[in-house]
Amino acid sequence: MIKFECVTELSELQCLFPGEPFCDNVRYAAYKTEYGGNDFSLLFSLNGNICILERIKSDKNEPSVTDGLLRSALDFAFRRGVDTAVCSLFKFSDELISLGFTQKDGVFSGNTAELLQGSSCKH
């Protein structure tokens, strides 16, 4: 089983994502894990009622790990009352679509509760 660790301290977020422009009035968090000797992390922000999936950092492409990172971030947002998730990370479009994100005008989006159910549960 893969364990995903939540990071909310700004100093640790800055170490995980050096050079990322963190805004003062936005709440950031990340999930990170190690799998098969490779490091993976997902940075996201909560801005009002929207969760923005900002950046995924990985040593290699591992769809099951990416899926776990995305689900962890969605769960974090959902538990804090956030209804909508958005993402512009086209490199991970297969994983986003498999979760149930829809694409419009260059952005993937969806309702956090529905996304946590996954596309296999939708009719």
Where are these regions (language model features)?
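Short amphipathic alpha-helix that is part of the acyltransferase structural core
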Residues: 1-25, 119-123
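Sterically constrained small-residue positions within well-ordered secondary structures
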Residues: 22, 44, 76-78
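Conserved donor-binding loop and adjoining core beta-sheet/short helix segment
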Residues: 27-64, 68
